[in-house]
Amino acid sequence: MKLSLLLAAPLGTLAADCTREFLKSAADSLLAAQAAGDPSLLKPVGSTLEYNENLKPATFASGILKTALKVDHSRHSLDTTQCATYTELISATGPKPYVNGYQLWFTNGSLTRFDGIISSTGDWLFNVTGTLHWASREAWTEIPADKRDTREAIKAGGDAYLDIFSDKSVVVPWGRPCSRLEGGAYTGNGGANDRCDVGIPDNVKLTNRRYVIDEVMGAVSIFLTFGSLADSHEFRLEGGKLRFVHTITPMGGNPGPSVGKGKGKGKGFRRRGEVL
């Protein structure tokens, strides 16, 4: 399904320099489309569009946007350098729970690539109650201009975290506190001593990385291949140090471990590398 270029033109004209305002408007239209189950509300869409879900080709007709989801929590990252967005969406109170990540990529003011990482019951450590509980308590606020890290530093921080899965000699800019929300499990309790350097497996390569970087939020979204699985890792850095890590890992129909029905607090639970 594609919108006409006539519909896309007004926003496309405004987006000539890819402003934060344009990107937020487009990302908000994604939320509207997902809430209504109506892909035509996603704007502006180009005359050609590459559409992927869980790193596999899909279409609007068969994809997640055809399912109306109650949006209980959402957050955007806006990358004006690459003209791209990342959106985290948690749907906890609808008929079927979801925790999804979306990267949207724009060319000449129109959407030309859609990537979704879609997770639900049975996926890695899935517990939407825990995800919503912790995500809604974290502070992902704008970082003052004089305290922002560079794009290069933000990307390097995310890459270092991912690289340590295959090379334990990598120096990762761990923050303290640093909290990881993995599925619905949390490596702490929201306190000053939270750590996210626990439960990291060995000898697992995280490849095919695609980045959306927002210096204003200190955030980088990375879609990647985790062994054989589609995966989303998102990081927030503050003062050059990792502060928050969010992960989404669909299991491709192979049920993953759960963390029960509680808030998902735990340490040392990350063992994906042993089962791929």
Regions found by a protein language model. Name each.
Residues 13-276:
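C-terminal and inter-domain tail/linker signature
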Residues 1-17:
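Fungal secretory targeting signals
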